[in-house]
Amino acid sequence: MKTLLLTLVVVTIMCLDLGYTLECKICNFKTCPTDELRHCASGETICYKTFWNTHRGLRIDRGCAATCPTVKPGVNIICCKTDNCN
């Protein structure tokens, strides 16, 4: 009985993945160095990348969010839910 209970606890922990935090890119370039990553805060389950053109060229903003941010017209956005997907 104790073995069964212990097995259930282990399986539950593995399925819930307790303590997991999403990791998103935070750089503002087309490609990001591997050290430009951030562990998102609790409740932030989305990585996003917004990008738009200016007179100075392409602008990019990346980060973590609880929901996919709303953007102004002319700004493109990509939202995703896996590590380093932005």
From Swiss-Prot:
Gene3D superfamilies: CD59. It is found in: Secreted. Residues 1-21 form the signal peptide. One of its GO terms (cellular component) is extracellular region. InterPro entries: Snake_3FTx, Snake_toxin-like_sf, Snake_toxin_con_site, Toxin_cobra-type. Keywords: Acetylcholine receptor inhibiting toxin, Disulfide bond, Ion channel impairing toxin, Neurotoxin, Postsynaptic neurotoxin, Secreted, Signal, Toxin. Disulfide bonds join C24-C47, C27-C32, C40-C64, C68-C79, C80-C85. Expressed by the venom gland. GO terms for molecular function: acetylcholine receptor inhibitor activity; ion channel regulator activity; toxin activity. Belongs to the three-finger toxin family. Ancestral subfamily. Orphan group IV sub-subfamily. Binds and inhibits muscular and neuronal nicotinic acetylcholine receptors (nAChR). This is Alpha-neurotoxin homolog 8. It comes from Micrurus corallinus (Brazilian coral snake).
